[in-house]
């Protein structure tokens, strides 16, 4: 039951609910559930908590594939990380005892390190469910430009550990216990609300502004049209919606990922639609297209200049396993035929995720992480360190139906805007699309599954936040801390009685 409550609380902190304050509560429940557990029970408790959390969070995986296997499989794999973390936590309980001021930073360090590992390995990792991405409506967002998702996640977990300690100490009764519980509550509140008093880092906004249009089209149902004609219809629908921006003074217009699944470089029909839209606007158009050089494909985001055609390209460097390419296809076909829905594997390009384009009488440098790449902070931070003035996040969410996937992704966009000190625009094939500001404000939001065209005045910023500068080093720090925790676990399990036979208070 405690595992389910933990998972529910963590899930509720993310979109669509965004009850950010439940994340520390979920952590507190997990801490309480793990106290006194033997190793095997701790692993099981952590796994069930992770399964409840991720199984709810990634419901869009079944929406995308049409089978429950994808959701269950992805949820179970991600839950293994929570299970492994629970084992390390359990050993830290044994080593550090009942000392919340030591346990809070220790457990938080391990949690963040496991998130870093999960976001990088295997197959490039999966950052979905990083605790910080559920805090965009809370006070901890102000911590993002100073310490990235790592510091925010650390604060959430440490606050949860202190909350559990406060409840446990208060139940003992007596004046000393009341004082101790109050101190733990105050410390937890300070971690969560203290960042409200932090100023925004002094990232320069002195390079002016630019008028950026972004367009959300309409994806026809497969029953309406299919194959090549369906891909061309998507591009035509975007071009039709783009006409709403004509004469409104846009300097640059963004289309989403997969705006042209036909190669706009080589397909004459797709290229003609894009060229006409760019020429009518009279400004550069950034759009997603695909290349098919052989029995594989690339996912590109390109600049298209009126009367000149393609000029500049970024190729997605982090294709999504099981979504854009199928690893070990033969093996996984033993479990489901859904693997063959991906009939042409996508290959990785290289970074940085940048496009340079002349617009509004100046040379612009735009960070362009494609779709899920917005969750990989290293990709975005690299682009900003190399001079990106704002962030465009082209994405195709059509496969995920009416699930919360696009809103969860937009929250990542919001977080990275705050982390990097850059205005960020998410532009989706079907929504949601919108603009996120570094101070947490959101504007020009679209309704999903409706053609939309919006025009936003975007500040062009230079300079970097502390988080952008140190993100990679901080990740190494947390991983080193977790490695020490892992050594403690190994030593603990090798001690006499370390297999769980030694007496433990409250053993179950």
Report residues per predicted region:
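Membrane-embedded alpha-helical bundles of multi-pass enzymes
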Residues: 1-199, 401-402, 413-416, 428-439, ...
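Residue-level detector of intrinsically disordered, flexible termini
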Residues: 22, 27, 40-41, 175, ...
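Soluble catalytic domains of enzymes that build or remodel membrane lipids, polysaccharides, and related
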Residues: 197-474
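Cytoplasmic C-terminal tails of single-pass
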Residues: 499-508
């Amino acid at each position: 039951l405690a595992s389910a409550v933990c998972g529910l609380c963590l899930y509720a902190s993310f979109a669509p609910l965004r009850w950010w304050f439940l994340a520390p509560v979920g952590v507190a429940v997990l801490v309480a559930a793990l106290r006194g557990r033997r190793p095997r029970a701790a692993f099981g408790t952590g796994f069930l908590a992770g399964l409840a959390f991720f199984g709810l969070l990634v419901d869009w995986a079944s929406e995308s594939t049409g089978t429950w296997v994808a959701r269950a499989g992805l949820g179970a794999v991600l839950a293994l990380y929570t299970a492994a973390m629970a084992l390390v936590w359990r050993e830290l309980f044994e080593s550090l005892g009942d000392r919340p001021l030591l346990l809070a930073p220790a457990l938080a360090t391990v949690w963040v390190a496991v998130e870093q590992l999960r976001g990088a390995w295997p197959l490039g990792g999966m950052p979905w469910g990083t605790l910080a991405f559920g805090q965009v409506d809370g006070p901890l967002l102000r911590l993002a430009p100073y310490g990235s998702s790592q510091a925010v996640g650390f604060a959430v977990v440490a606050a949860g550990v202190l909350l559990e300690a406060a409840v446990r100490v208060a139940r003992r009764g007596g004046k000393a216990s009341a004082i101790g519980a109050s101190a733990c509550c105050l410390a937890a509140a300070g971690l969560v609300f203290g960042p409200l008093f932090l100023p925004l880092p002094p990232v320069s906004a002195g390079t002016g502004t630019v008028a950026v249009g972004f367009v959300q089209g309409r994806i026809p149902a497969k029953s309406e049209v299919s194959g090549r004609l369906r891909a061309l219809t998507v591009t035509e629908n975007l071009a039709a919606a783009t006409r709403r921006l004509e004469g409104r003074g846009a300097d640059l217009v963004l289309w989403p990922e997969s705006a042209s699944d036909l190669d706009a470089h080589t397909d004459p029909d797709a290229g003609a639609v894009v060229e006409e839209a760019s020429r009518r606007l009279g400004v550069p158009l950034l759009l997603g297209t695909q290349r098919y050089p052989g029995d594989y494909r690339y996912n590109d985001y390109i600049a298209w200049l009126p009367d000149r055609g393609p000029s500049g390209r970024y190729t997605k460097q982090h294709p999504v396993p099981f979504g854009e390419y199928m690893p070990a296809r033969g093996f996984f076909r033993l479990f489901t035929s859904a693997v063959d829905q991906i009939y042409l594997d996508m290959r990785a390009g290289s970074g940085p995720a940048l496009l340079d384009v002349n617009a509004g009488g100046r040379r612009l440098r735009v960070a362009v992480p494609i779709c899920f790449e917005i969750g990989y902070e290293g990709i975005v931070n690299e682009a900003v360190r190399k001079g990106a003035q704002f962030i465009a996040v082209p994405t195709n969410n059509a496969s995920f139906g009416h699930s919360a996937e696009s809103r969860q992704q937009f929250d990542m966009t919001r977080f990275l805007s705050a982390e990097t000190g850059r205005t960020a625009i998410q532009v989706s094939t079907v929504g949601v699309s919108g603009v996120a500001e570094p101070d947490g404000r959101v504007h020009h939001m679209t309704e999903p599954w409706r053609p939309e065209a919006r025009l936003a005045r975007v500040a062009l910023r230079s300079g970097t936040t502390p988080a952008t500068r140190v993100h990679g080093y901080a990740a190494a720090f947390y991983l080193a801390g977790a490695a020490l925790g892992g050594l403690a676990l190994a030593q603990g399990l090798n001690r006499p009685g370390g297999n769980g036979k030694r007496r433990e208070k409250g053993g179950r």
